[in-house]
A protein has these predicted regions:
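Structural motif
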Residues: 1, 52-57, 97-103, 142-148
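Short, conserved, GDST-rich strand-edge loop motifs in beta-rich repeat architectures
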Residues: 49, 91-94, 215-216, 220-222
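Short loop/turn segments immediately following the C-termini of beta-strands
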Residues: 49, 93, 100, 138, ...
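Loop/turn-rich, solvent-exposed surfaces of beta-rich toroidal or solenoidal domains
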Residues: 39-49
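Serine-hydrolase catalytic core recognition
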Residues: 121-431
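Residue-level detector of Asp-centered blade-edge/turn motifs that repeat once per structural unit
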Residues: 39-41, 83-84, 128-129
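Multi-bladed beta-propeller domains
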Residues: 3-33, 48, 59-84, 92-95, ...
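Hydrophobic beta-strand positions that form the internal "hydrophobic ladder"
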Residues: 43-45, 88, 133
Length: 431
């Protein structure tokens, strides 16, 4: 809005609007702050998903014109205006949804240049004089290390640290997992990461790892924030399992339509994507359709429950870790964006909450939950357990962790949890 200070009148310059909810990198909402500021006394900059992807725009107040400085099927992140206000610096996944690089572009939209070139991920800070960048860089199987580089195209990075990987870590051949796309039932491309067994060790069983948070990206070329699960997936592959990890509908990094694909129905299109991944494994990778399991935590735990309760012919075993079981009892600020308010959209909550579909459980379920979880409260696991008891289900178990919050901190808890998950899969997928 523009305010005429003499009259107090307001004039609309631009509007962020979404039938689902406003979000995306640099736009605001979903954990992101909004990028907006002055290029000069007559021009402002901001980010918008108006094109379907979060891009950089400028608005000239004198001519009342808007211009997109970036455009395409990619997202702009970490926007910085140079101190002389001649350039914008930014991270984007222009080359590939799972690859980030650092760019600069003139404030008039010309002369866009890529400054970093390594395949992987970057977390970048500009030096005060903007002549250098310091960044953490990582690759799929190489943890984050610190580098510096001159802030110009074609310059070579200088590695500062070599501390992330211990000698024991380096002795193991961590998989450089393949990233590829599979086609969903509606024709959309789903980005996947595949952990393949070594030749001669493959069995016909598969496990799908379901990342948490909903709006998060885990199919990418940098070191995963799910590094424990990444290590566990390597272990599963060593034992002959084929493991697949997908960026299902509502994962980050893929634009507005993907981000809002679960509006009014969590466990809808996102679960369809998991089912389509399972069918891909059977059709293309020699997997037995009776030997597919899945696991995940938080939103991934919720998805595991929905999969076992509503798709029992697809998934034969699952581990739901700290799962949401009833969205009406979860964080209002998170849920109301996606499902609206329980009082005015009860249908969305009913069809999205696993506790309403417990009767569909036919196969084997492991639930793991910390008793002092301040994110997904332990009551979710208790209420679900009571419902399972009421329905006479005997193919489930609950592992309780008395000292753990949402993110476990005790090594013994992590070890116990993953020993139970491994036992679940070995028992019910390999028989």
């Amino acid at each position: 809005m523009q305010v005429d200070v003499a009259t107090g009148k307001l004039a609309l310059l631009d509007r962020q609007r979404d039938e689902a909810w406003i979000g995306g990198p640099g736009v605001g909402g979903g954990g992101y702050g909004a990028n907006i500021g002055w290029v000069n006394d007559s021009c402002i900059y901001y980010q918008s998903e108006a094109s379907g992807y979060s891009h950089l725009y400028v608005y000239n107040l004198r001519t009342a014109t808007k211009k997109a400085l970036t455009q395409g099927k990619y997202e702009v992140q970490n926007l910085v205006l140079s101190s002389n206000k001649k350039y914008f610096y930014l991270l984007s996944n222009e080359a590939h949804p799972g690859q980030k690089n650092w760019y600069r572009i003139k404030t008039d939209g010309t002369q866009k240049e890529k400054i970093t070139n390594q395949l992987g991920g970057y977390e970048i800070s500009l030096s005060p004089d903007e002549k250098w960048i310091a960044f953490r860089y990582s690759y799929i199987n190489k943890p984050w290390e610190l580098f510096i580089q001159e802030n110009e195209p074609g310059k070579k990075p200088i590695q500062i640290t070599d501390k992330a990987a211990s000698e024991e870590f380096k002795k193991y051949a961590w998989r450089d997992t393949k990233i590829k796309t599979i086609v969903a039932r509606d024709g959309q491309n789903i980005y996947t990461r595949i952990y393949e067994p070594k030749p001669g060790t493959k069995n016909k069983a598969a496990v799908i790892f379901v990342h948490g948070a909903g709006y998060l990206q885990n199919v990418h070329y940098w070191w995963s924030s799910y590094f424990r699960e990444q290590m566990f997936n390597n272990l599963l592959a060593d034992k002959g399992y084929t493991v697949i990890d997908i960026d299902y509908r509502a994962s980050s990094g893929y634009g507005r339509d993907w981000r809002t694909g679960i509006y009014r129905f969590m466990g809808g299109k996102d679960l369809d994507d998991e089912v389509d991944a399972a069918k891909y494994l059977v059709k293309n990778m020699g997997i037995d359709s009776n030997k597919i399991g899945l696991y995940g935590g938080s939103y991934g735990g919720f998805m595991t429950l929905m999969a076992l309760f509503t798709q029992p012919n697809v998934f034969k075993a699952g581990a739901a870790l700290r799962p949401v079981t009833d969205w009406a009892h979860y964080n209002h600020g998170y849920t109301s964006n996606i499902l609206n308010e329980p009082v005015n959209d009860s249908i969305a909550y009913a069809k999205s909450s696993p506790i309403n579909f417990v009767g569909g459980l036919k196969n084997h379920l492991l639930i793991c939950h910390g008793m002092v979880d301040l994110n997904v409260n332990f009551q979710d696991a208790v209420r679900l357990s009571q419902r399972l008891i009421e329905l006479g289900k005997d193919n489930w178990e609950l592992a309780v962790y008395p000292v753990e919050d949402h993110g476990f901190v005790e090594p013994s808890s992590w070890t116990d949890e993953y020993k139970r998950i491994l036992k679940l899969f070995d028992t019910y997928l390999l028989k």
